[in-house]
C-alpha cells in the first residue's frame, strides 16, 4: 500500500520552515568584533596619502608619508611630502622629532598632532577611546565594513560633522567632514602586518 500523503497544511508548514531557515539573517558585525579584528596584528605599517579639500582653494592640498603602528603601544607618523615631519603618539603623549633627532613633547598640540592621535585610535581599533567622543554606527561585515563617527562631545562637535572609516581586514580609508566646510580624505596603502619595523619606527617607539 502507498504511504499516506501529509495534509496540505502540513506541507505548507514544512515549506515555510525550510524557507525561513534559508533566509535567516546573519548576525550583525559588532564594534567589539571590529576592534578585535583591528587589534589582532602585533604591528601594522604602510603608506598614507591625504587630500585636504579647503573651501578657499580650487585644488586639494596633498600630503603623504609612512606610518607604523603597534596597537596599544604607539604610532609613528612620518610625513614626507610636502615637507618632512616625524610625530609619535604614545601613552605619555604626542612628541615631535627635532632637527637633532631628539623627541620633544608637542606642547602646542597642533591640529596635525591631534589628527594623528585620532588616527592612532582609528587604525588600532580603539573603539573605547572613540566612543568617548563619538557615537558609532557600523555597517557591513568583517571583509568590508564602514564605521561612521558622529561627534557627541562639545569639542568634537566644534570640529567635525562626521567621520567615515572604511576597510576590510585593516583600515583602508578615513574621510573627515569638518564644520567649516573643509574635507579630508586619508587613504592607507601598501599595508603590512607583523613585519619588522624600520629602524626609525623602532627608535621612535622605544624598541
Language-model segments: which ranges?
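Sec-dependent N-terminal signal peptides
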Residues: 13-22
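N-terminal leader/targeting segments and the immediate start of mature chains
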Residues: 20, 27-49, 53-60, 203-207
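Short, Lys/Arg-enriched N-terminal segments with co-localized hydrophobic residues
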Residues: 1-9
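Acidic/charged, solvent-exposed loop-and-adjacent secondary-structure segments enriched in E/D, K/R, S/T
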Residues: 98-121
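Structural recognition of beta-strand segments within beta-rich domains
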Residues: 55-61, 66-71, 75-81, 86-89, ...
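Short hydrophobic/aromatic-rich beta-strand segments that constitute the beta-sheet cores
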Residues: 48, 69, 75-79, 94-97, ...
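Gly/Pro-enriched, hydrophobic low-complexity segments
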Residues: 127, 131-135, 139-207
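Well-ordered beta-strand positions in beta-sheet-rich domains
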Residues: 62-66, 86-88, 104-106, 162, ...
Amino acid at each position: 500500500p502507498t504511504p499516506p500523503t501529509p495534509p496540505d497544511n502540513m506541507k505548507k508548514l514544512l515549506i515555510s520552515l525550510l524557507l525561513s531557515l534559508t533566509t535567516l539573517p546573519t548576525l550583525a558585525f559588532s564594534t567589539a568584533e571590529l576592534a578585535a579584528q583591528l587589534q589582532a596584528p602585533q604591528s601594522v605599517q604602510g603608506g598614507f596619502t591625504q587630500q585636504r579639500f579647503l573651501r578657499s582653494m580650487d585644488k586639494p592640498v596633498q600630503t603623504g608619508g609612512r606610518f607604523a603602528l603597534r596597537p596599544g603601544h604607539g604610532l609613528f607618523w612620518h610625513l614626507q611630502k610636502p615637507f618632512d615631519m616625524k610625530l609619535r603618539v604614545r601613552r605619555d603623549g604626542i612628541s615631535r622629532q627635532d632637527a637633532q633627532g631628539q623627541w620633544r613633547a608637542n606642547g602646542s598640540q597642533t591640529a596635525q598632532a591631534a589628527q594623528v592621535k585620532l588616527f592612532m585610535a582609528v587604525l588600532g581599533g580603539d573603539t573605547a577611546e572613540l566612543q568617548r567622543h563619538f557615537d558609532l554606527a557600523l555597517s557591513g561585515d568583517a571583509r568590508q565594513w564602514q564605521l561612521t563617527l558622529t561627534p557627541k562631545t562639545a569639542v568634537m562637535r566644534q570640529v567635525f560633522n562626521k567621520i567615515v572609516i572604511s576597510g576590510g581586514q585593516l583600515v583602508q580609508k578615513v574621510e573627515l567632514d569638518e564644520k567649516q566646510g573643509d574635507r579630508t580624505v586619508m587613504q592607507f596603502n601598501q599595508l603590512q602586518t607583523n613585519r619588522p619595523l624600520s629602524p626609525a619606527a623602532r627608535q621612535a617607539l622605544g624598541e
